[in-house]
């Protein structure tokens, strides 16, 4: 398959505040060089859940640019609490997770409604750990299973889970804020109780590898019905993690 390169164009004079336009502008401002492989694998006409490894604030804009559509990404609870960052979260259409003590019922309700409206949802299954700890481009944390539950419960006949590997070839790593300062906005987050600074990975050259989608439909659910919901969710989670791990190795 030929590797396709997608130039990042300057902000047009007719620039709108759509999440896709904001993403393109942010990538232009950052001067990132990116390429995409496997874009033709993204299904058309059905809701999608985009999942990916996650090390940088640039990941969501990159995924929107690669898929050429707005994607409503789940994000950490604290991001909806910080002045300035909160406004960016709203402009990008992100959906902050609920406060830990409240569970995630309200978040799942919003996400399921978005899928019912055929919107694209983005989930970073590794959680926040690779964002606050310094990692290597090919490192991968164990996936949480929330995205699989979301896909299984979506009130639609058919939905695709699309795994994407973000493979950084060249980057800068800066320190932006003391981790403990963030505990002011989310005291229950254990990652914010540690010493050190929140890193900020800025990609300079990156490839997005779009993997094989997993289509969840009536046939899929019926095939695994005897295994039970928990076993099916585990299998879907492991399948997507293995796909992204394989793509990251290919991109090294």
Predicted regions and their residues:
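A conditional alpha-helix N-cap/helix-loop micro-motif detector
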Residues: 32, 53, 78, 101-105, ...
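Charged, low-complexity C-terminal accessory regions
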Residues: 203-205, 213-252
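Generic beta-sheet signal
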Residues: 46-52, 119-125, 159
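A cross-family acyltransferase "interaction/gating" segment
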Residues: 135-224
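Catalytic core of membrane glycerolipid acyltransferases/transacylases, capturing the structured
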Residues: 44-102
């Amino acid at each position: 398959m030929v590797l396709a390169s997608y130039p990042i164009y300057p902000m047009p004079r007719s620039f709108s505040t759509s999440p896709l336009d904001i993403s393109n502008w942010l990538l232009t401002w950052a001067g990132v060089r990116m390429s995409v492989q496997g874009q033709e694998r993204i299904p058309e006409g059905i809701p999608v859940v985009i999942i990916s490894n996650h090390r940088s604030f640039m990941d969501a804009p990159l995924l929107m640019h690669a898929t050429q559509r707005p994607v409503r990404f789940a994000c950490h609870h604290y991001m909806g609490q910080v002045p300035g960052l909160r406004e960016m979260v709203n402009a990008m259409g992100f959906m902050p997770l609920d406060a830990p003590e409240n569970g995630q019922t309200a978040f799942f309700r919003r996400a399921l409604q978005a899928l019912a409206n055929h919107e694209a949802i983005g989930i970073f299954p590794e959680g926040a750990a690779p964002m606050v700890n310094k990692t290597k481009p090919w490192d991968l944390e164990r996936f949480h299973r929330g995205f699989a539950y979301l896909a299984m419960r979506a009130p639609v006949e058919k939905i695709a889970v699309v795994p994407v590997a973000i493979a950084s070839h060249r980057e800068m790593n800066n320190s932006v804020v003391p981790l403990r300062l963030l505990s002011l906005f989310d005291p229950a987050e254990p990652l914010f109780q540690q010493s050190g600074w929140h890193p900020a990975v800025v990609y300079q050259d990156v490839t997005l590898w779009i993997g094989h989608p997993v289509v969840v439909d009536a046939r899929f659910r019926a095939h695994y019905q005897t295994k039970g919901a928990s076993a099916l969710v585990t299998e879907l989670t492991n399948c997507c993690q293995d796909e992204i791990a394989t793509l990251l190795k290919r991109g090294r």
